[in-house]
């Protein structure tokens, strides 16, 4: 595990599952993980995806196109987001999904990819599948397994999920 890099728990919400088919980000949530494991500075932004939200995605996170159309576009928030995460190691649950969407958004605005800005990525889904192997590894299952209070979370949300991820990461990295 990195010790010299700043750690940031990150989660996203999207219009659907496939950035290669035009699905877009609708929310980014980031929470710094301090050296004592506590949450630090945070960044959260709703985003106008410039397209409708699929019914399936809306059931997951509760955001509709009507709720998002007045939010800034990714191009408008890219600098603030990248400044927040620059030089950090990102802690992401199912990193392939989130990094795929972030890279797709960065490509649209000609800003390279996440690897250009961040030191690395720790995928807590991969960690969870190793410790102990064979057990459910969803964020919900890990919160339950580690007795993390997720009662304030009725739907997925990038910010609340990144806050829960701080606790899940701390629990996973304390396991032998």
What is the role of each PLM region?
Residues 1-2, 168-176:
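Acidic two-metal-ion nuclease catalytic site recognized across multiple nuclease folds
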Residues 100, 125, 163:
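Active-site phosphate/pyrophosphate-handling residues
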Residues 1-118, 129, 133, 137, ...:
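Conserved non-catalytic scaffold segment of RNase H-like nuclease domains
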Residues 157-169:
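Acidic, divalent-metal-coordinating active-site segment for phosphoryl/phosphodiester hydrolysis
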Residues 144-147, 166-171:
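Non-catalytic, well-ordered alpha-helical segments in soluble enzyme domains
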């Amino acid at each position: 595990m990195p010790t010299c890099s700043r750690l940031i728990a990150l989660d996203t919400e999207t219009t659907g599952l496939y950035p290669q088919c035009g699905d877009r980000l609708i929310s980014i949530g980031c929470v710094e993980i301090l050296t004592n494991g506590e949450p630090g500075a945070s960044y959260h932004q709703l985003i106008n995806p410039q397209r409708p939200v699929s019914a399936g995605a809306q059931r997951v996170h509760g955001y509709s196109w009507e709720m998002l159309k007045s939010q800034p576009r990714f191009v408008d928030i890219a600098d603030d987001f990248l400044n927040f995460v620059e030089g950090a190691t990102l802690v992401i649950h199912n990193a392939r999904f989130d990094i795929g969407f972030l890279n797709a958004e960065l490509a649209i605005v000609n800003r390279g990819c996440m690897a250009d800005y961040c030191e690395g990525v720790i995928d807590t889904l991969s960690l969870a599948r190793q410790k102990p192997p064979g057990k459910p590894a969803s964020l919900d299952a890990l919160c339950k397994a580690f007795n993390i209070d997720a009662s304030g979370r009725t739907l997925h949300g990038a910010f609340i999920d990144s806050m829960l991820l701080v606790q899940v990461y701390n629990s996973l990295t304390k396991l032998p």
